[in-house]
């Protein structure tokens, strides 16, 4: 919304604001029996339009300095009014329009609420004017909280000597960081990495963020002691205002802050280049003080430079050869910064839970070497193999030009008490659709990166456990799964992390794709703002939009994977024991096509999957590809999701499963559609009956094989005793998947324990993964022998389940 002049922009914004007020004021003329919702729904988007107009005006350079606060106040007023109108609509049972303008208005509100961190106001970034450091000396009433080590040194706050500004930013030569008595090693490691990178590749770390600046864009001494630091905080570049006072020891004048010196530095009392301690003061101010224990260097580099952060665990599932190659190639182009983190257990010479910076990496013959910087000590070298063994995490920051195309969205998660009493918190997860289009389909498919960031408000409030789930539709050419999500086993690691940034690198499978992005959080107890950034190479275009939380018809059901029902993935013989549901899709209005959506939210440590099957609402014992209508794809921790573009009116069976047998947990399942749907549980096999489970083993002596083999009577026998007539059913299966054909036959017990009359058999020997079943049958009271056998005298374990509508006993007798 570009404006030619300040007056034009102010008039547009004011007119929209007045129109919104007049629309809302018309409520007073409504009949007492008329609903206020339609009028409020008209007023809401007009308020948002007014807020957008004020926002565009503020982001321009048209507003005179003297009017900025007035325009900001009007902007806040219309936003606050919009929030109140939206809240009123929802209280009355209505919904605000799902138009893009509403999303934009909500995003503006999210960024505005994120402007207070640890009690420090951090307004959205605007380049400061040339005279902001003129006038009376600027001194803040409260200085950042000091760390215990600083307090022990009898601190005082005083200004930097003017001649210190002769030591300018480290753009050439060798500069070193000295941490000093500061608790946070991560930001010092980040700054050390940035300075070394600047010396090698000419990047500008930190000093371009500090104002005022001279004609060359370098920080200079403030005339009145007021500085402004530019940091990327809570989804946007923001201003941190600070004064020029720094802590020194009264005893010996030693600086009680991190310093940056030409190597080697001369005296312990030397301040070095003043931009570094001042930039760090601004950082510590907004993060709660010098006593901050630290996070990780990649988050700090992201705040100062906007380089994309990535954390890679060096233990489970780490591919060291692949990562070295990727990292080394980017390093030599100046496209990556590297840092490291230790865990709670370290070898001698390393500090636990400590951050280290990598200032150089190289190959010497067959050796791969890293030069590592310790903020609290000195530098040392390690081989790549040593690093992978000794450190817990690899932190990378990627130059934004590597992924120049971006799309960004902001939103807020409500705190649980704000949800309706019958709401499932998982269903409140905001969903986005990322449309990806490669300009040259013939080229090799690239990755897209998606960064989930949670906004911080206080150092005393713990971060949420967050995850980002990415699902890709297979597209119209995959007729088997009707556009269901691509399936490929199990997620490599649990995606939940207790961090403020989480990067997912997603390998595209087609030039044009629609990715469904579902951020989720676990145990979140507060309203929290979040930002979602998508990144792609120059050859790929992106669009990111929020999608509706629900389709018109929704059915929800809660369930539980228990020790008895958790059967694992379809490769396990026990998959049939998983919870199954009858799903009925009824015809919609007219001849319109029906689409659907499956969403499951479960415990975050369990990998989940849901399949919709042509099962006619009956139990499905074994899956085949032609039965699958829709599939949520790879087993994913905490969530399962898929869109179903085409859904026929019919009766289906739906199966919920975890990856491994015995993985238990509660879940909430939602089935949405554009036509009426219903979902009800299907009773498990043998439900409501007495049950006995017999575990046995075919040994060299007892593997008798099939009847025609001559040794059939050597097979194990399970004696079943019925005290009165009963209906029974039984199933024999192998505990692990195996191509061994098996059979179960039931005999009357003859005199002396011999096999008597054959009553029922499961038929031809079968290697079906779910085993073989006798089905339901009626038997008189008496003693019976059940004989499990394999076709080829195979040795190994077997499991026999027997159900009866009367009490029974069953045990191996031979």
From Swiss-Prot:
The keyword Protease applies. Keywords: Hydrolase, Protease, Thiol protease. GO terms for biological process: proteolysis. It comes from the Eukaryota. SMART domains: calpain_III, CysPc. GO terms for molecular function: calcium-dependent cysteine-type endopeptidase activity; cysteine-type endopeptidase activity. Gene3D superfamilies: 2.60.120.380, Cysteine proteinases (3.90.70.10). Its EC number is 3.4.22.-. It is an enzyme of class 3 (hydrolase). Residues 118-400 form the Calpain catalytic domain. InterPro entries: Calpain_III, Calpain_III_sf, PalB/RIM13_Calpain-like, Papain-like_cys_pep_sf, Peptidase_C2_calpain_cat. The active site is at residues 185, 354. PANTHER family: CALPAIN-7. Required for the proteolytic cleavage of the transcription factor RIM101 in response to alkaline ambient pH. Belongs to the peptidase C2 family. PalB/RIM13 subfamily. This is Calpain-like protease palB/RIM13.
């Amino acid at each position: 919304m570009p404006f030619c002049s300040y007056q034009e922009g102010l008039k547009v914004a004011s007119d929209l604001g007045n129109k919104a007020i007049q629309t809302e004021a018309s409520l007073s003329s409504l009949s007492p029996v008329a609903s206020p919702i339609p009028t409020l729904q008209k007023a809401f988007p007009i308020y948002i339009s007014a807020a957008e107009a004020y926002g565009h005006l503020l982001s321009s350079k048209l507003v005179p300095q003297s009017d900025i606060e007035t325009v900001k106040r009007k902007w806040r007023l219309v936003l606050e009014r919009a929030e109140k109108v939206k809240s009123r609509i929802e209280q009355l049972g209505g919904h605000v329009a799902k138009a893009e303008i509403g999303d934009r208005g909500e995003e503006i509100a999210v960024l505005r609420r994120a402007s207070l961190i640890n009690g420090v106001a951090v307004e959205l970034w605007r380049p400061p004017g040339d005279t902001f450091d003129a006038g009376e000396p600027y001194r803040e009433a409260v200085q950042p909280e000091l760390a215990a080590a600083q307090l022990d040194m009898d601190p005082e706050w005083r200004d930097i000597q003017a001649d210190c500004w002769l030591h300018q930013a480290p753009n050439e030569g060798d500069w070193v960081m000295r941490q000093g008595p500061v608790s946070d090693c991560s930001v010092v490691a980040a700054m050390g990495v940035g300075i070394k990178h600047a010396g090698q590749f000419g990047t500008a770390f930190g000093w371009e963020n500090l104002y005022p600046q001279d004609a060359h864009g370098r920080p200079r001494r403030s005339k009145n002691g007021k500085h402004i630091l530019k940091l990327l905080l809570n989804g946007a570049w923001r201003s941190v205002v600070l004064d020029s006072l720094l802590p020194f020891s009264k005893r010996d004048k030693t600086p009680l802050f991190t310093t940056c010196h030409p190597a080697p530095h001369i005296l312990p009392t030397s301040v070095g280049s003043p931009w570094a301690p001042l930039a760090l003061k601004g950082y510590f101010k907004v993060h709660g003080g010098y006593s901050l224990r630290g996070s990780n260097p990649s988050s700090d580099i992201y705040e100062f430079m906007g380089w994309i952060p990535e954390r890679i665990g060096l233990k489970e599932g780490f591919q060291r050869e692949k990562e070295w190659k990727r990292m080394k190639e980017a390093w030599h182009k100046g496209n990556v910064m590297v840092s490291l983190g230790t865990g709670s257990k370290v070898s001698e010479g390393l500090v636990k839970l400590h951050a280290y910076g990598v200032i150089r990496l190289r190959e010497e013959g067959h050796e791969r070497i890293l030069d590592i910087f310790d903020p609290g000590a000195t530098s040392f070298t390690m081989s790549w193999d040593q690093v992978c063994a000794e450190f817990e995490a690899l932190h990378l920051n990627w130059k934004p030009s590597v992924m120049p195309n971006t799309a960004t969205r902001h939103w807020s998660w409500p705190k649980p008490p704000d949800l309706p009493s019958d709401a499932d918190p998982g269903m409140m997860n905001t969903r986005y659709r990322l449309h990806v289009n490669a300009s040259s389909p013939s080229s090799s498919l690239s990755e897209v990166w998606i960064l989930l960031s949670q906004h911080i408000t206080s150092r005393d409030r713990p971060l949420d456990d967050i995850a980002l789930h990415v699902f890709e539709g297979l597209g119209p050419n995959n007729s088997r799964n009707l556009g269901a999500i691509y399936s490929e086993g199990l997620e490599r690691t649990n995606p939940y992390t207790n961090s403020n940034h989480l990067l997912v690198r997603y390998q595209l499978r087609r030039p044009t794709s629609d990715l469904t992005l579902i951020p989720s959080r676990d145990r979140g107890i507060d309203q929290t703002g979040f930002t979602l950034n998508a990144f792609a190479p120059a050859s790929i275009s992106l669009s990111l939009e929020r999608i509706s939380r629900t389709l018109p018809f929704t059915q929800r059901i809660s369930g539980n994977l228990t020790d008895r029902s958790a059967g694992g993935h379809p490769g396990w013989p026990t998959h049939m024991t998983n919870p199954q549901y009858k799903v009925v899709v009824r015809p919609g209005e007219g001849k319109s096509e029906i689409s659907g959506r499956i969403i499951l939210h479960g415990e975050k440590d369990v990998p989940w999957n849901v399949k919709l099957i042509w099962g006619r609402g009956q139990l499905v014992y074994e899956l085949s590809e032609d039965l699958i209508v829709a599939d949520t794809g790879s087993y994913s921790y905490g969530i399962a999701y898929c869109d179903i573009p085409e859904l026929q009116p019919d009766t289906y069976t739906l199966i919920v499963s975890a990856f491994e047998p015995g993985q238990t947990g509660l879940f909430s399942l939602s089935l949405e559609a554009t036509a009426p749907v219903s979902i009800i549980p299907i009773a498990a096999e043998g439900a409501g009956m007495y049950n006995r489970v017999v575990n046995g083993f075919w040994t060299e002596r007892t593997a008798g094989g099939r009847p025609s083999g001559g040794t059939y009577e050597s097979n194990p026998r399970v004696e079943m005793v019925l005290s009165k007539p009963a209906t029974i059913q039984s199933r024999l299966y192998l505990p692990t998947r195996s191509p061994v054909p098996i059979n179960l036959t039931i005999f009357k017990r003859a005199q002396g324990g011999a096999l008597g009359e054959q009553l029922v058999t499961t038929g031809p020997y079968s290697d079906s993964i779910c085993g073989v079943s006798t089905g339901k049958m009626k038997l008189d009271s008496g003693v019976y022998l059940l004989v499990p056998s394999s076709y080829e005298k195979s040795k190994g374990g077997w499991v026999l389940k027997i159900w009866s509508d009367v009490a029974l006993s069953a045990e191996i007798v031979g």
